[in-house]
A protein has these predicted regions:
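Serine-esterase "nucleophile elbow" of acetyl-processing enzymes
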Residues: 19-94
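Bacterial Sec-dependent N-terminal signal peptides
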Residues: 1-21
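Short coil/turn segments at secondary-structure boundaries
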Residues: 3, 71, 108-111
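Alpha-helical cap/lid subdomain in secreted, periplasmic
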Residues: 60-62, 66, 82-150
Length: 150
């Protein structure tokens, strides 16, 4: 009996070792999956980024059904890069990109953020060369920003 209890205890302690670690949040996965199903066309204007983008009703604000929100709250540069394919496949007319502030809150270096934004820009330019890209500045922050943990 003692051996069975020890065996079960050992198995229970080992379970976390086998659990697959998630790369992104459930919210990210839900939004990214939704965006894969929503078509992008060459007439579209895409707002791409994090919660600042996610939190606005862009089509209503501009009264234009071709304006599409592709923001995900909490997103980081590599999150945007990982979900670019359905966007560039549609070869949109314009992309407004605002990303990087959540990388700052996670302690990512400025050089790494610049490198990852450059990867995003290169992919857009290579796969959708006629798309006009509007790169928006990462918002300035002070030392207390880390307390928000975007």
């Amino acid at each position: 009996m003692k051996r069975i209890v020890l065996l079960l205890l050992g198995l229970l302690l080992a379970l976390p070792q086998f659990a697959q670690e998630r790369k992104y949040s459930t919210f990210y996965e839900q939004r990214a999956t939704l965006f894969e199903e929503l078509p992008v066309t060459s007439k579209d204007i895409i707002f791409l980024g994090n919660s600042i983008t996610n939190g606005c009703e862009w089509a209503e604000l501009f009264q234009n059904k071709n304006v599409k929100n592709r923001g995900i709250s909490g997103d980081i540069c590599m999150g945007v890069y990982d979900r670019l394919d359905p966007i560039v496949k549609g070869k949109p007319a314009k992309i407004f990109l605002l990303i990087g502030i959540n990388d700052v809150s996670r302690g990512t270096s400025a050089d790494k953020i610049i490198s990852e934004i450059s990867m995003i820009v290169r992919k857009i330019k290579q796969e959708s060369p006629k798309t006009k890209l509007y790169l928006q500045s990462v918002l300035p922050v002070n030392d207390c920003y880390g307390m928000f943990n975007g």
